[in-house]
């Protein structure tokens, strides 16, 4: 998560609370967005895009699992002059972690694991990680499923901390064996369960648990148990399927007047369970509908309940550990989701930043409202922060009935 955007994310979460507060004992689901309000959102969106040098992006308001309003900007492919549109596929980076978390809770609800189980039951290789406190029983044996989900395990943040930045290097380790070979050269950074510390590899280990229990590769399990029943048929990980390639956005890196095209596809390797998700905004709207249980038709609501119980989702959003100064926009980490309490309401969400793509997912579960912001550009100089905050304010205000 890039420091330049942290204050912006606080505005998003805070304003979402104000924008969707319901009357007592009644869910408020706005039916339409005032034309003048959405016009101001699009103006702010374009002001940020110009200030930050964004090549392409989308802002989307979601109600009851469907897109209520959207605004697309710029190009999905600069060289080919291909515009962003309804079908454009973005990379959602760390928002992927929420899928892995949902999958783990599915297995818990089926009685196949417990949140306080030791992870080394399925991933014994973790015992090779150095314990600087020299406990008689390695500290890795005290890491639980719950700790991995809530980023409180003591494991490091980056999956591969030794990159030299050479163009020929793989983007990330590509095989489980490579990750295992690294373990004796890593250490725990704090006592497991004692505090918060964001960890990308923790979600790779959760995926390993899923694979050991089910026998399915992580991506196959997600396809069968989340995307298919939720009608998210254009979501995928890894290389873009041929039939979707015309819709895939490129990623871009901007530094001053210099723009680098990072291409459409890249290999996230072993990190797919923490950052591999690619999808159009329509699929993300369906995902918000699942999280909130708010689709208009009863058949969809029933199908969503078969994916994961409402009570389990609420459990996932409950705070487990307070975040630290590195994550000021959220007060707490839950089980795969971050949360902020404001005016008695809980806002949940996750963000992503990888390979030129930035993504923002924020949801008010009580009202069923959500906001999605997606960009295909990283600005190495953090330009446009003030404009981004103004955009967030207007976008969230548009949720009001």
Question: PLM ranges: what are they?
Answer:
Residues 37-41, 121, 165-191, 216-235, ...:
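Short, charged, amphipathic alpha-helices and their helix-cap/turn boundaries
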Residues 9-19:
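Bacterial N-terminal signal peptides
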Residues 1-10:
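Bacterial N-terminal signal peptides that target proteins for export
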Residues 80-84, 181-190, 263-271:
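Short glycine/proline-rich turn/loop motifs
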Residues 21-24:
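Sec/Tat signal peptide C-region and signal peptidase I cleavage site
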Residues 57, 86, 91-95, 107-156, ...:
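Active-site helix/loop module of the DD-peptidase/beta-lactamase fold
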Residues 26-71, 160, 166, 211-216, ...:
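Catalytic loop of the DD-peptidase/beta-lactamase superfamily, centered on the K-T-G motif
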Residues 39-48, 59, 65, 89-116, ...:
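Active-site SXXK
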């Amino acid at each position: 998560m890039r420091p330049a955007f942290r204050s912006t994310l606080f505005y998003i979460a805070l304003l979402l609370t104000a924008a969707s507060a319901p009357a007592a004992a009644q869910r408020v689901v706005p039916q339409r967005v005032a034309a003048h309000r959405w016009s101001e959102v699009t103006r702010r969106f374009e002001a940020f895009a110009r200030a930050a040098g964004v090549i392409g992006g989308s802002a989307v308001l979601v109600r009851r699992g469907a897109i209520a309003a959207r605004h697309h900007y710029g190009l999905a492919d600069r060289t080919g002059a291909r515009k962003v549109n309804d079908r454009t596929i973005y990379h959602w980076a760390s928002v992927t972690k929420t899928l892995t978390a949902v999958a783990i809770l599915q297995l818990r609800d089926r009685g196949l694991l417990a949140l306080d189980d030791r992870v080394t039951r399925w991933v014994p290789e973790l015992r090779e990680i150095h314990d600087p406190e020299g406990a008689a029983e390695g500290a890795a044996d005290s890491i639980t499923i719950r700790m991995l989900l809530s980023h409180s395990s003591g494991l490091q943040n980056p999956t591969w901390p030794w990159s030299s930045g050479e163009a020929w290097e793989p983007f990330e380790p590509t095989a489980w064996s490579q990750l295992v070979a690294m373990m004796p050269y890593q250490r725990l950074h704090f006592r497991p369960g004692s505090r918060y510390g964001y960890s990308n590899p923790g979600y790779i280990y959760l995926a390993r648990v899923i694979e050991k229990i089910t026998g399915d590769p992580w991506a196959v399990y997600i396809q069968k148990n989340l995307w298919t029943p939720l009608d998210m048929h254009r979501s995928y990980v890894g290389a873009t399927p041929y039939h979707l390639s015309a819709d895939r956005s490129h990623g871009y890196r901007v530094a001053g007047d210099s723009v680098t095209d990072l291409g459409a596809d890249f290999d996230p390797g072993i990190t797919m369970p923490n950052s591999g998700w690619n999808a159009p905004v329509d699929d993300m709207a369906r995902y918000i509908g699942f999280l909130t249980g708010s689709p208009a038709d009863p058949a969809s609501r029933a199908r969503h309940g078969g994916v994961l119980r409402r009570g389990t989702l609420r459990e996932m959003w409950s705070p487990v550990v307070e975040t630290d100064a590195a994550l000021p926009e959220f007060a707490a980490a839950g089980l795969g989701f971050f949360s902020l309490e404001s005016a008695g309401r809980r806002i949940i969400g996750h963000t992503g930043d990888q390979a030129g793509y930035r993504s923002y997912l924020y949801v008010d579960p009580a009202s069923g409202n959500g906001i999605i912001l997606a960009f295909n550009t990283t600005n190495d100089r953090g330009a446009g922060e003030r404009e981004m905050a103004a955009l967030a304010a207007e976008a969230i205000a548009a949720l009001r009935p």
